[in-house]
């Protein structure tokens, strides 16, 4: 797991553990090559910038944020990742001082719509980042900025500035290729017929498919058997 430290002016350190297999190498772009290129390019610009991208839940937006964090963390550059769907574990003050980081990732911003304290905290962070010109700010949501139902007008308008992308969903063929890519990165082969079988018999949401792939990898190692359709049926009870 990737550990990300958020350093605030109060010297508060919050370790966040992100999946170490969610990197750019494991991100299957599909029709999202332009978004992937925009994020990669922005990571190495000398001045700060802002990118917003959105997708339905499970569409890969958190994966892309985790990958960006991992990329800069390997270079020992300071990054921050704030999953707003888990804001019950934070307070808005956690955003204080984050403009000094190289990268700030705010995930699931739709979660704070109507929360006055959090909306103001994100708005103030956005302005500080613009003033310092240092950090790359990546924000994700489940819909376009104008449809977020953000009540603070100034924040709603700021979110609609900059580069905005829709993270396009993968086709079934692309999902199969994404599964095979993840398998290769883990050191095993996922036969194409097994990949097609999984897509036919399981929920096609990528998070579910990747969790199933992890389960099959473990079962294959334990039983010392290759992945075949009969073996997969046995393990998954299908």
Swiss-Prot record:
This is DnaA regulatory inactivator Hda. SUPFAM superfamilies: P-loop containing nucleoside triphosphate hydrolases. Pfam families: Bac_DnaA, Hda_lid. The gene is hda. Keywords: DNA replication, DNA replication inhibitor. InterPro entries: Chromosome_initiator_DnaA-like (IPR020591), DnaA_dom (IPR013317), Hda (IPR017788), Hda_Enterobact (IPR022864), Hda_lid (IPR055199), P-loop_NTPase (IPR027417). The active form seems to be an ADP-bound monomer. Forms the RIDA complex (regulatory inactivation of DnaA) of ATP-DnaA, ADP-Hda and the DNA-loaded beta sliding clamp (dnaN). Mediates the interaction of DNA replication initiator protein DnaA with DNA polymerase subunit beta sliding clamp (dnaN). Stimulates hydrolysis of ATP-DnaA to ADP-DnaA, rendering DnaA inactive for reinitiation, a process called regulatory inhibition of DnaA or RIDA.
